């Protein structure tokens, strides 16, 4: 693959430079390679690879039977048959071109002295599709390689483009490898441009010079992020582009022998900064909120610092264990650039897959504990991938701020301890959980949130044809009143007692709250009261719990089964909790603002 060729070229250039020896690299450009390869050459290559006659005929029929017509002034020309080239965009085309080129690569590696990779391994050419390199230790061997290559392409309908070719030819001067600045090689009588000591050429998307591969930079990332921040898009659209298109564009370029931990960390820093700008998050927002997977309670922003080394480590392991003709074990075992790169990547990837780490960070950190339960049900996280119908960009941003603990309160860590008290006068820290779940100022808003959730479940039950009582009064014989949220009468004499509650996701599992809620009614006293109210019914106690930050816990599975709650209703309840969380916080802020002491009068100037 591309990584093998890149490592090979990097290893060769740096190894020869370290030893102060001569080396020669010629980058060849094939003029319109995929458009000019002859069809007989493709047929010959397939025969050489042992492809059976039936498959040969089938493949050739897709190529040789192609034709086009040109319409000029209302008149159509005769059929113009395509005699050369392969179809652009056809997934089979690169394979056909590669097998045509394979004969040349094999011939060069067998007949030419080539470049010394290890004491037992020499390679004269590196090829990937139409990206072709010639490697030679001695400059006197390069003309023979060029002549063989030109003759091979000429007989197959292809030609080289000397203007786009480049060469690096280094001589030994005082024990050092010094690249020549004057042209040394020709193609059909025309000189190939020498690169010298400062010029570069592109190979497989990476930049190479006489010193090896160039280090990746964050220049493009900085420019892309700046344009993204200025783009007239909604916040969810910007974040989608960042995650799905922009950051993945860096993956290939960062899988380079020149990559360092510092470059990867800078990419992560820039991505986090842009994410915070998109959602108006505080600077102190924990990285676990950003880098944890969506199913683990985060936003799913890929972390380059650990993801790229993990990818590279797997690819290098596959190379080392591979069965190709190149003995990668020898290359990685001898002292040299390839070995240094191999062990550097192993060190950078020593922590392994970052996903378990960030999941544990979500679970153990005080501001994010409980969000790991987003993995229990897709409804808890689907809104992050697809914005719910009817939501505005502001709604989405506020929901993200709620999930990441960024709705403004006095209890945030940057506040001094003596200033963290609730501004409503409560003897509690003004944390987000207190504002949404406990502050008397937001009591009526919490009741509205609860009633909306109950109404959704009751509507679903009535659609099923079940008789549904909302907040029925159930008296015990000693006068004690019970008032469950829902009493749902199902067929076969079953009565489901369902109580809806919104809890804060924290260190205490929501499953514990679910059990505690069930025991409020699943006891002998309520059973006696239920018999007096409804007669001899088969009682089923199954509460419905939701997290205040939009978590649908696994504990609700029995309730979902009993009431046949669909995915759409689960998602709707989660969206209700998220929107009401924003509304409750807004009501709290408006209330404490109205109660603030008046500003002191300004002094009157004399």
Curated annotation (Swiss-Prot):
Domain of life: Eukaryota
Pfam families, per database record: RVT_1
Entry's EC annotation: 2.7.7.49
Gene Ontology MF term list: endonuclease activity; RNA-directed DNA polymerase activity
Residues annotated as domain Reverse transcriptase: 1-208
The protein, known as: Retrovirus-related Pol polyprotein from type-1 retrotransposable element R2
Annotated keywords: Endonuclease, Hydrolase, Nuclease, Nucleotidyltransferase, RNA-directed DNA polymerase, Transferase, Transposable element
InterPro entries recorded: DNA/RNA_pol_sf, RT_dom
Region (Nucleic acid-binding endonuclease): 331-606
Reactions catalysed, as given in the entry: DNA(n) + a 2'-deoxyribonucleoside 5'-triphosphate = DNA(n+1) + diphosphate
Catalytic EC class: transferase
